[in-house]
Amino acid sequence: MQAWEEFLKAQEVELGLETVQKWLRTLKIQRFDACNLYLEAKDSFQALWFEEHIRNKAQQKFINGNNKRIKIHLSVANTPQRAKKTKTANKEKDFKAPFELTFDELDPLCLFPYFISTEENLLSHQLLLEIAGLSPQIHSTQLGTFNPIYLYGSGGSGKTHLLMSLAHALKAQGLKVIYVRAETFTDHVVTAIRAGEMSVFRQAYRNIDVLLVDDVHVFSRKGATQEEFFHTFNTLHLEGKQIILASECSPQDLQLIEPRLVSRFEWGIVLPLKPLRPGEMRNLLIAKAKALHFELPLKIADYLIETFKSNAKALIKGLEALVLRLHLDAKHSITALSVTATKALLIDLIEEEQKTAITPQKIIQAVAEQYGIRTEDILGKAQTRECALPRQLAMHLCREQLKMPFMKIGDLFSRDHSTVMSSVKSIQKSLEQDDREISGICHIILKKLQG
């Protein structure tokens, strides 16, 4: 086929002769017509490589003599082992099990009544309540009014809880709803490519009313996944189906994700979510304990908050483990539960938390590594921008992540509290003004600190 040969020669110039010989010329042409080319890959790895590196190029540049695009259909050849199994199955008049996608399960306790709303998160909470039809507002926001809805915030800010709460509410109304983590979506793409079942994949993701995707920042560097999600997004959006996304960072701060996807993420409404403060954490614990039919003593709630500081997820995990282990361990009385007994029951989780807990020293070290300077430079007296900006950022993170008093931060950095307040205010102002450099560095450092 002349058009295919011309395309391969163009790829030899772009990718190199050896790469094309290894990955493209070994594809077997099954059949072709004016607008379709059917290829067979020798194995799933070759098919996946094609999807990652060539599919997008072929859609743009693979055309026939009439300047019309030629669609490539790719399947995977049967290996001898697979062929043997197929032969045996046919002999026994058996049939191959249908290709199926397994979606993420919804946490039954992630419901709107158990979400602790704060002043900062009120808009996001209210919007999703309206979409779910659970708001007392007379003129409520309907599905599709904002499309997509993009929620972002650090770990433990409530993104997953809100998404799952909405999924529960909409499913109860009889709507076809998919909640999926970005990692699961990626697994589905890879599995479907390997099985030659992309049509099943597309039908599963497009024959729905609402799509909720958690952790979309995970799409970073995944070319085939981004390509498939781009087309899934377009199809659903054109049909007026609601799309709701969640991520650890705003669309502008997403790393290594195609600009065309980033721009689509901003088409609707982008809403930030803030983690709970220590006082609000107690309300969260009490509400969660109530959902578990467990009366949590306040002294134990305060101990859990003091112990599991990394994020709300770690805190809830600690509570759930405590409730389960209390029910399994007859030695401890729920009514007379002590801090000592709680510590004994959760010792493994406490040790795990201590390994990952953020400390002022870890913050200073992470900032120094990010800027390529020494920790002594951050703690020293130098006023050059190379040292002053990292120092201000470290102070801001100590205040934001650890809720350290200004006086205590001043003692750590050998500065008076007014200097610390000025430094923290300077970074906060940059973040409020959407300084992409500062916000991007903050995001990278927090990712390192949170493992």
Swiss-Prot record:
PROSITE patterns: DNAA. Residues 105-326 are annotated as: Domain III, AAA+ region. Residues 68-104 are annotated as: Domain II. Residues 1-68 are annotated as: Domain I, interacts with DnaA modulators. CDD domains: AAA, Bac_DnaA_C. GO terms for biological process: DNA replication initiation; regulation of DNA replication. Plays an essential role in the initiation and regulation of chromosomal replication. ATP-DnaA binds to the origin of replication (oriC) to initiate formation of the DNA replication initiation complex once per cell cycle. Binds the DnaA box (a 9 base pair repeat at the origin) and separates the double-stranded (ds)DNA. Forms a right-handed helical filament on oriC DNA; dsDNA binds to the exterior of the filament while single-stranded (ss)DNA is stabiized in the filament's interior. This is Chromosomal replication initiator protein DnaA 2. The lineage of its organism: Bacteria, Pseudomonadati, Chlamydiota, Chlamydiia, Parachlamydiales. Keywords: ATP-binding, Cytoplasm, DNA replication, DNA-binding, Lipid-binding, Nucleotide-binding. Pfam families: Bac_DnaA, Bac_DnaA_C. Residues 327-451 are annotated as: Domain IV, binds dsDNA. GO terms for cellular component: cytoplasm; plasma membrane.
